[in-house]
UniProtKB/Swiss-Prot annotation:
Family (UniProt): Belongs to the flavoprotein pyridine nucleotide cytochrome reductase family.
Residues engaged in binding FAD: 149-164, 175-209
Keywords on record: FAD, Flavoprotein, Membrane, Mitochondrion, Mitochondrion outer membrane, NAD, Oxidoreductase, Transferase, Transmembrane, Transmembrane helix
UniProt GO cellular component terms: mitochondrial outer membrane
Protein name: NADH-cytochrome b5 reductase 1
Domain FAD-binding FR-type residue range list: 61-169
GO BP field: protein histidyl modification to diphthamide; tRNA wobble base 5-methoxycarbonylmethyl-2-thiouridinylation
Membrane topology, from the record: Single-pass membrane protein
Pfam families: FAD_binding_6, NAD_binding_1
GO molecular function, one term: transferase activity
Cofactor requirements of the protein: FAD
UniProt pathway annotation: Protein modification; peptidyl-diphthamide biosynthesis
């Protein structure tokens, strides 16, 4: 649901002022009907309020089609795809930390078609009505990612959801330790943005994120991450590169147990580790976190787990 205030102008214009005029007019014309007018204003105001709420469009069991509105090329194999929702005030209705499923009929080498489904986490949120954004890296062997790369503005994709075991709520932990590799940054960014937006309402969650990539050019959404770090002292990002440029001052190589111990919070009941990236990286990090004293990660993570892999 959109994070908005009941003091916004649209509520004054659409609810408070009309309700006030109804009650005020009744007092002038027939004072003894004031109570009935107040009840009518309350009922009509409630109806109008619920009609003004953002319309959630996702259906967990049903694929729906959404039109590609805009495509922003980030690099030779990465793009941000913006899809249009049915109305300007529609939202996906996607809880923070969950993802959507994209389905497509993909042609196979033998000429047949096969239904392929893959999961993606939008980098936009329900506070941005009317559209949703997907950051997707295309791989030579990636069925859906190649299909997405071939999409033209005006064409559609099939989406259903929400999916996923993780749902973020403010102050669910004191401190998140995060490790992301490549496009695994998308659920982390979604959670971090929610934390920063929630500061005014009392969200005190701290975040340390290790973001691993091959080269500096592979660091996705670096400007967005750096802006969040500059804006919020409770957010820290530690970049790690396998092939760093000359003069690089960040981490080098694969994310190791020593890096996790040095850069992420220590094991505690109010600490949670979030992981998202290539399977070999996640497998190694599950072993590393267990060796450091965190609870052993399950093969399939659940919300209550101390180490959660998306």
């Amino acid at each position: 649901m959109s994070e908005e205030s009941l003091l916004e102008r649209k509520y004054f214009d659409g609810i408070y002022i009309p309700a006030g005029l109804l009650v005020f007019g009744t007092v002038i014309v027939k004072k003894e009907w004031t109570l009935y007018a107040a009840l009518a204003a309350l009922i009509l105001g409630a109806i109008k309020y619920f009609r003004m709420l953002p319309k959630k469009v996702l259906k967990p069991a049903v694929f729906q089609e959404f039109e590609l509105k805009e495509k922003t090329i980030i690099s030779h194999n990465v793009a941000i795809y913006r899809f249009k929702l049915p109305t300007p005030d529609s939202v996906l209705g996607l809880p923070i930390g969950q993802h959507i499923s994209i389905g497509a009929a993909i042609e196979q080498p033998d000429g047949s078609t096969k239904e392929i489904v893959r999961s993606y986490t939008p980098i936009s949120g329900d506070h941005q009505p009317g559209y949703f954004d997907l950051l997707i890296k295309s791989y030579p062997t990636g069925n859906i990612s190649k299909h997405m790369a071939s999409l033209q503005v005006g064409q559609t994709i099939r989406v259903k959801g929400p999916k996923g075991a993780f749902v973020y709520t403010p102050n669910m932990v004191r401190h998140f330790g995060m490790v992301a590799g490549g496009t695994g940054i998308t659920p982390m960014l979604q959670v971090i943005r929610a934390i920063v937006r929630g500061r005014a309402a009392g969200d005190r969650t701290e975040v340390d994120l290790i973001f691993a990539n091959v080269t500096a050019q592979d660091i996705l959404l670096k400007e967005d991450l750096d802006a969040l770090v500059a804006q919020d002292k409770g957010i820290r990002v530690h970049y790690v590169l396998d092939r760093p440029p000359e003069g690089w001052t960040g981490g080098v190589g694969f994310v190791t147990q020593e890096m996790v111990e040095k850069l992420l919070p220590k094991p505690a009941s109010d600490v949670k580790i979030l992981l998202c990236g290539p399977p070999p990286m996640i497998s190694g990090l599950k072993k590393a976190t267990e060796a450091l004293g965190f609870q052993k990660a399950r093969p399939v993570s659940k919300l209550e787990d101390q180490v959660f892999a998306f």
